[in-house]
């Protein structure tokens, strides 16, 4: 405990560079709830307002990809003249030191943990062994956690040591806290922000939803040391984000596109960043953010500490780590091969497009017998997400949809309704396949099979989180047959039953090609658009008289 000394806790609101306090409470959560009120009538009655919403826009909101970062000035770093900073805080607990190497090896083996790199610290088995200062420890214990997850056991000593870190772990493994708590310790060891300073900690995330989830954790655990944060992402007005940045925040959680917008406009800078986190690095690369990530990192001093977190370890992620991390240490939880969470029961049904709707209803009838269940339904396109939602609502099911064309306030409202169980059926595209942190999702249904096995793993990983069990149901058509072999490999590794027709596709080599997933059922590309008047209309469709739940 004393290894951090007593001086890291920020005193009171000590002006943080003259900015003063929490600035009307806005520093937390400008990314979240948007303020509007949808309960009193917007949805279900007259729709989501007569105009404005449903204009289309584009999935990424402010995160346009074209020529982002062209206006950023190239930074020349002279390490001799840069201010020094602290990043090594870890002191091994006597109980950890006392364990034999055999005990350490057995612990790692039991938790399917492998480590790589020089002088990797030993894992800790309790929160006290991590050696966090009391102000961090009390926040953790107040949340009722019993013991660290596997990634936390090994990741905390690694991150607190000041080394560059790579962590590979399944979704729902507790990785957010693995970098958040060391970030809080790191901030409290640095000089206070001066006017004009940018953040000390930068967290890059692929989606708005994940960014808001991270902000919630940072806010919760940074409260006692009065650490301010903001969430910077596209699809919402820039004004509140600009205000937060100008007042000064120690932590900035951002999607790459909107952050570059802010940097190019001179709204913030990254000169003070000494702790950089790349969360879901594989997903950011999948989404085409690599050029933006490279431009952002070029604005950060090279002797920073960098932590990279990913669910998979493909060659593109390995290359990024090689380019931007120095002498890094790595922890992998689980197999390095693509694998699914073994607490999830996977049911794959080979169907035709025309069977999907009826089969979905049969599953819903069974699942919703238990009113505490929550189901997340994934579709291949935004159009199908809206059409299914409209169909389900008209059939009496309390369904809402979320995807990239919906404005941020609507997305926040839908997520809150789903979390609260008021609308226990949520239909989503892959914009929601990561970053949605709803811990009690009991079922996932893949109405359309995703484009690749990685997305399949991440979709079904929305259930079975935090030690719970879950069920994933997947509709697989002949159009998906080129992916049959990969899917069978995943099912076999997780010891799941395999539909004989799926095995047959593998045996005969498939050959369906890339079809349109679920379009057939809905009568072609034009069908259904006119009824609703924009993407929002699906959530405004009145519930049918035949209430199914």
From Swiss-Prot:
It is found in: Cytoplasm; Nucleus. A motif (Q motif) lies at residues 125-153. Its EC number is 3.6.4.13. Residues 156-331 form the Helicase ATP-binding domain. It is an enzyme of class 3 (hydrolase). GO terms for biological process: nuclear-transcribed mRNA catabolic process, nonsense-mediated decay; rRNA processing. The keyword Nucleus applies. Residues 1-41, 523-549 are annotated as: Disordered. One of its GO terms (cellular component) is nucleus. Associates with polysomes. ATP-dependent RNA helicase involved nonsense-mediated mRNA decay and ribosome biogenesis through rRNA processing. This is ATP-dependent RNA helicase dbp2. It comes from Aspergillus clavatus (strain ATCC 1007 / CBS 513.65 / DSM 816 / NCTC 3887 / NRRL 1 / QM 1276 / 107). The lineage of its organism: Eukaryota, Fungi, Dikarya, Ascomycota, Pezizomycotina.
């Amino acid at each position: 405990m004393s290894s951090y000394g007593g001086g890291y806790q920020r005193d009171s609101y000590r002006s943080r560079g003259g900015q003063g306090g929490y600035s009307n409470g806005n520093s937390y959560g400008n990314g979240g709830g948007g303020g509007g009120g949808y309960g009193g009538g917007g949805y279900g009655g007259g729709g989501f307002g007569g105009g404005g919403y449903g204009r289309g826009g584009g999935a990424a909101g402010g995160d346009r990809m074209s020529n982002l970062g062209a206006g950023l000035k190239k930074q020349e770093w002279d390490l001799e003249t840069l201010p020094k900073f602290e990043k090594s805080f870890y002191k091994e607990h006597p109980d950890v030191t006392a364990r034999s190497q055999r005990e350490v090896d057995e612990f790692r083996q039991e938790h399917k943990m492998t480590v790589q790199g020089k002088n990797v610290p030993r894992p800790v088995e309790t929160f006290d062994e991590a050696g966090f200062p009391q102000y961090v420890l009390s926040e953790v214990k107040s949340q009722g956690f019993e013991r660290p997850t596997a990634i936390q056991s090994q990741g905390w000593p690694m991150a607190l040591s000041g080394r560059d870190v790579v962590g590979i772990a399944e979704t729902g493994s507790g990785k957010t806290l693995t970098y958040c708590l060391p970030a809080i310790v790191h901030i409290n060891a640095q000089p206070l922000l001066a006017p004009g300073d940018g953040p000390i900690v930068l967290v890059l995330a692929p989606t708005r939803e994940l960014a808001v989830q991270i902000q919630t954790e940072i806010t919760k655990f940074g409260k006692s040391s009065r650490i301010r944060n903001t969430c910077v992402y596209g699809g919402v007005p820039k004004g509140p984000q600009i205000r937060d940045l100008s007042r000064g925040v120690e932590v900035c959680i951002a999607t790459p596109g909107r952050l570059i917008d802010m940097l190019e406009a001179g709204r913030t800078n990254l000169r003070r960043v000494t702790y950089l986190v790349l969360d879901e690095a594989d997903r950011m690369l999948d989404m085409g953010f690599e050029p933006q990530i490279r431009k952002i990192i070029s604005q950060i001093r090279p002797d920073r500490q960098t932590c990279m977190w990913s669910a998979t370890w493909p060659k593109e992620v390995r290359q990024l780590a090689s380019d931007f991390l120095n002498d890094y240490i790595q922890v992998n939880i689980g197999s390095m091969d693509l694998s699914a969470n073994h607490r999830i029961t996977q049911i794959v049904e080979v169907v035709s497009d025309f069977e999907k709707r009826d089969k979905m209803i049969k599953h819903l009838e069974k699942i919703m017998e238990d009113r505490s269940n929550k189901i997340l339904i994934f579709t291949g396109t935004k159009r199908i997400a809206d059409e299914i939602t409209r169909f389900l609502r008209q059939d009496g099911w309390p369904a809402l949809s979320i995807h990239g064309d919906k404005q941020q306030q609507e997305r926040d409202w839908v997520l809150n309704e789903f979390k609260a169980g008021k609308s226990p059926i949520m239909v989503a595209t892959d914009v929601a396949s990561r970053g949605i942190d709803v811990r009690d999702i009991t079922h996932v249904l893949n109405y359309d099979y995703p484009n690749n096995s990685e997305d399949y793993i991440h979709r079904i990983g929305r259930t079975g989180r935090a030690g719970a069990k879950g069920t994933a149901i997947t509709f697989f058509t002949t159009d998906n047959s080129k992916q049959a072999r990969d899917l069978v490999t995943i099912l076999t590794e997780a010891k799941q039953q395999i539909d004989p027709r799926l095995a047959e596709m593998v045996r005969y080599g498939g050959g369906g090609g890339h079809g349109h997933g679920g379009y057939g059922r809905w009568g072609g590309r034009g069908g259904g658009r006119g009824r609703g008047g924009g993407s929002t209309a699906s959530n405004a469709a009145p519930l049918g008289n035949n209430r199914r739940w």
